[in-house]
Amino acid sequence: MITTTSQEIELAPTRLPGSQNAARLFVAQTLLQTNRLLTRWARDYITVIGAIVLPILFMVVLNIVLGNLAYVVTHDSGLYSIVPLIALGAAITGSTFVAIDLMRERSFGLLARLWVLPVHRASGLISRILANAIRTLVTTLVMLGTGVVLGFRFRQGLIPSLMWISVPVILGIAIAAMVTTVALYTAQTVVVEGVELVQAIAIFFSTGLVPLNSYPGWIQPFVAHQPVSYAIAAMRGFAMGGPVLSPMIGMLVWTAGICVVCAVPLAIGYRRASTH
């Protein structure tokens, strides 16, 4: 009997502990849903045009109209401000399209159907954050490629270049969290578009187009300390040289603050949208 028991134990299949198995399923299901979102966004020509084509055209126009003016003011190529500005703008615009897509899935009942399936509950929300980060990365690379064609060049080496690319992705996560939170608590796309308008104002009232001292004194504190200005200053420093520590810390503080504020409402809103 002892021999038989030993043989049975040896032949028994090895199983992962419950926590390890759940973690493995969570990762697999998150990647699967991320791929689903990216595939659908890539096939949506409106999203592609709004998130990639229009920013490219806007960059070309800004370079033609303001490139020489920026050179007169800064004594350097205006592309070192225009390319970061458009990369951040594309990240913000794309986040709005992502939020509207979430509202569409909620209205079609897809979120509710996914909620009752044997799928990790957190994978649906995490996959959207991951998919948006990948989308922002792709958009940033496209904007960078366009800037290189126009004459943009990195002057600080490989590591600062990679840090330059990471800035829109990091800030884009916070922007996506904020816009998605708003989208989960409203059924009107006009509200989400209103949030995009506020973000667009933040883009234009930044140090991306004109230096800080060109603004009226009463608005300079807002312009200097808003997240887009911090991000543009960091990207400019990574590309052509200059201070990067202070603007990078400012951008990271803004990102962390937005994510912390939105974390609980985002989780509650996603659960409510998936169960109603």
Swiss-Prot record:
UniProt domain ABC transmembrane type-2: residue ranges: 46-273
Topology within the bilayer: Multi-pass membrane protein
Segments traversing the membrane: 46-66, 82-102, 129-149, 159-179, 190-210, 248-268
PROSITE patterns linked: ABC_TM2
Protein location: Cell membrane
Keyword match DNA damage: no
A GO CC annotation given for this chain: ATP-binding cassette (ABC) transporter complex
Keyword field: Antibiotic resistance, Cell membrane, Membrane, Transmembrane, Transmembrane helix, Transport
Any coiled-coil regions, as ranges: none
Main localization, broad class: membrane
MF terms (GO), sorted A to Z: ABC-type transporter activity
Example GO biological process: response to antibiotic
Misc note: Was identified as a high-confidence drug target.
Entry similarity comment: Belongs to the ABC-2 integral membrane protein family.
Function in brief: Probably part of the ABC transporter complex DrrABC involved in doxorubicin resistance. Probably responsible for the translocation of the substrate across the membrane.
Oligomeric and partner information: The complex is composed of two ATP-binding proteins (DrrA) and two transmembrane proteins (DrrB and DrrC).
Entry protein name: Probable doxorubicin resistance ABC transporter permease protein DrrC
Species this protein is from: Mycobacterium tuberculosis (strain ATCC 25618 / H37Rv)
Organism placement in taxonomy: Bacteria, Bacillati, Actinomycetota, Actinomycetes, Mycobacteriales
Gene name, Swiss-Prot/TrEMBL: drrC
